Amino acid sequence: LGAVKVNNKIMTELGYRVKPNDVVHFDGQKLQAEKPAYVLLNKPKGFITTTRDEKGRRTVMDLVANATTSRIVPVGRLDRPTTGLLLFTNDGDLAKKLTHPSTGVKKLYHVVLDKTVSGQHLQRIKSGITLDDGAIKADEISFVQGASKREVGIALHSGRNRIVRRIFEHLGYEVVSLDRVLFAGLTKKDLPRGHWRHLSQSEVQQLK
């Protein structure tokens, strides 16, 4: 096995975590650390949230292919028909923090349904309903201002699979469209559908 040196000292400690300013050599060659990358995408319909798809379907990675040379991965997921904000990074610690249930990252969705939503059902979602995988309740829910009663804004911190769709399906509605408009304080402002941008330093600090 080749010798690993950190800051010119042979590394014998297992599990040592390399720090951003460490200089690492392997077999005499200096290793270049990847720069941290944080990319925000406004995902369109029809793309799968995965790093590769064996069936050859379009993935979100196709949309951010030119964003960075770093090996970024999506933080969480949006299903194929869902649109809106999806974050990518190579910062494993931040990705873990943002997806861990205890962190309680706020996500806001704009939901369009196949029929008018009753006020009683809004109240039930706010109070809590029980799905196959346990209880769930919205942090906030209301009709979208100036829109029809088929359009609802719902805020959740749950990361459970298809949770928004399942909430409304449980109450007899069909979700016509689902758009994530806020994720962990990040919004879609000045970010058209299908486009991406790099996070600012202050946005990264806010997430950490």
Residue ranges and their predicted role:
Residues L1-K208:
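Basic, flexible Lys/Arg- and Gly-enriched helix-loop patches that mediate nucleic-acid binding at interfaces
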